[in-house]
A protein has these predicted regions:
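A ligand-binding cleft/hinge motif common to bilobed small-molecule-binding domains
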Residues: 86, 103-111, 160-163, 182-185, ...
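Alpha-to-beta junction loops
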Residues: 39-40, 74-76, 93-101, 146-148, ...
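Ligand-binding clefts/hinges and TM-proximal coupling segments of bilobed small-molecule sensing domains
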Residues: 23-25, 156-173, 212, 242-271
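Flexible hinge/capping segments at coil-to-helix
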Residues: 129-147
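Extracytoplasmic small-molecule ligand-binding "clamshell" domains
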Residues: 24-102, 111
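Short helix-initiation/N-cap motifs at beta->coil->alpha
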Residues: 63, 79-89, 171-185, 220
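Short Pro/Gly-enriched coil loops immediately N-terminal to beta-strands
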Residues: 43, 61, 114-128, 144, ...
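Periplasmic-binding protein-like
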Residues: 121-128, 195, 199-241, 260-271
Length: 271
């Protein structure tokens, strides 16, 4: 009996130590950020979430969000531009503290990272070639082996394409500009992207492009992403999102970047 009790005490002590270790790790990220005085933000450039202006500085919805978040916390902000298909691995490797980059909340991604509550919502739309697809107006028209659809690698529209157009050939690119160029060059019938980019591309190229569907193909929520276990940081970020949602600031920035074109003359044409 004494031996059994001794074993139980040992097990309990180990579990208590493990819990204390987890608790220490839990507060580690937020404490480290406070001590460093800088919030490191991972993002990938794509219009109008994040892009370069004519002076080479980052601007966009996510840039505004990250700057306001850091300012409210009394921190400096450091942006870490990262290729989209490698942004989650970079977060897990400690290259930055948080992803603020229009990252769609999905169960698959949630297996690797912690997501905050949504801070914005978006949708996926299709842009098609007038030359190659003028008579294609249904999902079935694009769900054929003879159809090529261009998308940005690692982005949520990839999932939409695979779900709705499993028979089509999917061609993936490092950025959306290349995907749309593939359609303009006549190498793909269509491209998928998050709004408002498809609408803007049609406005810029009315003679070449059109939108075959009036309603979005899918809708989705976006959240900040942090490393698993950083629950104190998660609590802070969720509370910040709630405060800036309730006071209307997030909606104000969303309306400016997604519902107007007032900012377009600021943008570097190479974005």
């Amino acid at each position: 009996m004494k031996r059994f009790i001794a074993v139980l005490v040992t097990v309990f002590t180990c579990l208590l130590g493990a819990n204390n270790a987890f608790a220490a790790d839990d507060s580690n990220a937020l404490q480290q950020i406070k001590e460093s005085g800088t919030l490191r933000v991972g993002l990938s450039t794509f219009v109008p979430w994040a892009m370069r202006d004519k002076q080479g500085d980052l601007i966009g919805f996510e840039v505004d969000v990250a700057k306001r978040l850091a300012a409210d916390a009394g921190l400096k902000v450091e942006f870490v531009p990262t290729a989209w298909d490698g942004i989650i691995p970079a977060l897990l490797a400690g290259k930055f503290d948080v992803i603020i980059g229009g990252l769609t909340i999905t169960p698959e991604r949630n297996m690797s990272v912690l997501f905050t509550h949504p801070y914005s919502y978006s949708a996926v739309q299709m842009v098609a070639s007038k030359k190659l697809a003028s008579k294609m107006t249904t999902i079935a028209d694009y769900n054929k082996r003879s159809v090529t659809i261009a998308v940005r690698s690692g982005a949520y529209p990839v999932q939409t394409a695979r779900k709705l157009f499993p028979k089509a050939k999917l061609r993936q690119f490092d950025d959306e500009t290349q995907a749309f160029q593939e359609v303009l060059n006549g190498n793909a019938q269509a491209a998928l992207a998050s709004t408002p980019t498809p609408e803007q591309m049609v406005i810029k190229n009315p003679e070449s492009l059109f939108m075959p569907f009036k309603k979005p193909l899918t809708r989705y929520a976006t959240g900040f992403a942090i490393r698993q276990g950083d629950f104190n940081l998660l609590n802070f970020l969720n509370n910040w999102i709630q405060v800036r949602t309730e006071d209307g600031w997030l909606n104000n920035r969303y309306q400016y970047w997604f519902k107007t074109t007032d900012w377009q003359n600021l943008v570097n044409e190479n974005n």
